[in-house]
Amino acid sequence: MFFLGFLSVTMDYWSTKVKIYSYTLLTLLVITLICYLIHIFCKLRMKKNSVTNNMPPPPPPYTVSSRCSQYYID
């Protein structure tokens, strides 16, 4: 009789432990899914912004004219 009571307590302990692990795993899975969706949303938004705000390329760097070369000492 004592053994059956101990077994039921042990089963309750393990089922509680399994429930805790299951809920923890489910919570982590949901958090991961939310973060992944936010990541995709931000990536698409930045891609959209880069297309709409397409800036012209910067001007080429200025070159030194040949007249200034006389000031250089060889």
From Swiss-Prot:
UniProt KW Disulfide bond keyword: no
Transmembrane segments: 20-40
Organism listed in the record: African swine fever virus (isolate Tick/South Africa/Pretoriuskop Pr4/1996)
Extra facts: Encoded wby inverted terminal repeats (ITR).
Topology within the bilayer: Single-pass membrane protein
Protein name: Uncharacterized membrane protein KP93L
Signal peptide: none
Recorded GO CC terms: host cell membrane; membrane
Family of the protein in this entry: Belongs to the asfivirus KP93L family.
Top-level lineage group: Viruses
Keywords of the record: Host membrane, Membrane, Transmembrane, Transmembrane helix
Location relative to the cell: Host membrane
